[in-house]
Structure formats: C-alpha cells, structure tokens
Amino acid sequence: MEQYHGTTIVSVRRGNQVALGGDGQVTLGNIVMKGSARKVRAIYDGKVLVGFAGATADAFSLLDRFEAKLQKHQGNLLRSAVDLAKDWRTDRALRHLEAMLIVADREATLVITGNGDVLDPEGGIAAIGSGGSYAQSAAKALMENTDLAPRDVVEKSLRIAGELCIYTNTNFVIETLE
C-alpha cells in the first residue's frame, strides 16, 4: 500500500526566539490528497513546538508517544527525545515507522529520527522532509545575511521550498516561542 508523504518542516532559532513551520500538503504517490494539513503544533501547554514529516499515520503515532514522554519527564525536551528515539529504535512495531520529528522549546531544537538519532542542529536551523534541503539552505542564507526574526525566516524559507519542491505547497502553519 502506498504511503502518504512529502512535506517541508523548518525551524529557526535566533536569540531568545524560535519558530517552527511547515507546509500543508499531503501527497499520495503523485496525487495531492490535502493542501491544508497541520504538521506543526504547540504541545505541553504551549511550551514545546513539534513538526513532523513522513508517513502521516506514523508521524501522529510518534507525536502521541513524544507527548507522553514529555509528561513522564516533566517537560525535559532532551530526555523525552532520547527516550522516544530509544523506544523507536528498539521496539519491533515502532522500528518500522517512517517519519521524522523536529522538536523545540525555549532552550533547544532537536531532530529525532527512526535510526535512534537525536540531533542538535548547527546554527539554530533544522529542516526535514522532501523540501527540507531547500528550506534549510534558504534559512541559512537569510540568517547569515539579514536580521529577520525567526518567524519571517521560516516563512520565507518555506516559500522558497514550496516553489522548488513538488511535495511542498505554500499553505503554512508557523508556531513561535519567545
């Protein structure tokens, strides 16, 4: 059975601000199934931002598990991410989930993968999904050459990715923490 896939999620951190945004396109093969999906959310009483890319059902399953880990570890982002990655890597059922997450709070941004990786991205920029490379490149250039706020960098980066990646549209959801 073919999976739903394709998206762009990007996070930018500057000073005491962090923004996380994503597009709204859900694709099944070469068909756009939905253009307004919400793949970025504020969770844990608005203290943590999370964005996901990959197979939609898998991503929602991981999002639920990550929220449970945050509750268990009283909002400690790193411990929650490592605990989720460990389960994801070792659990037989979870091991087959095809998705990635970017999570962020006031102090850190992390990328969580199904390989058991918890990555702290360099330069305060993280991006995943089919248009992630485009968005990350655009965000890096904007961060190095402008004084734009993280939200504006995320929006412009997503717009560029949406113009280049066929699996990314320009219907964005952007969340911020200050």
UniProtKB/Swiss-Prot annotation:
Annotated GO CC locations: HslUV protease complex; proteasome core complex
Function: Protease subunit of a proteasome-like degradation complex believed to be a general protein degrading machinery.
Classification via Pfam families: Proteasome (PF00227)
GO biological process, one term: proteolysis involved in protein catabolic process
The organism of origin for this protein: Ralstonia pickettii (strain 12J)
Chief localization: cytoplasm
Homology family: Belongs to the peptidase T1B family. HslV subfamily.
Catalyses which reaction(s): ATP-dependent cleavage of peptide bonds with broad specificity
Compartmental location: Cytoplasm
CDD domains membership: protease_HslV
Subunit structure, interactors included: A double ring-shaped homohexamer of HslV is capped on each side by a ring-shaped HslU homohexamer. The assembly of the HslU/HslV complex is dependent on binding of ATP.
The organism's place on the tree of life at top rank: Bacteria
Transmembrane portions of the chain: none
Name used for this protein in its record: ATP-dependent protease subunit HslV
Regulation: Allosterically activated by HslU binding.
Active-site positions on this chain: 7
EC code: 3.4.25.2
Keywords carried by this UniProt record: Allosteric enzyme, Cytoplasm, Hydrolase, Metal-binding, Protease, Sodium, Threonine protease
Sites where the protein binds Na(+): 162, 165, 168
Molecular function terms from GO: metal ion binding; threonine-type endopeptidase activity
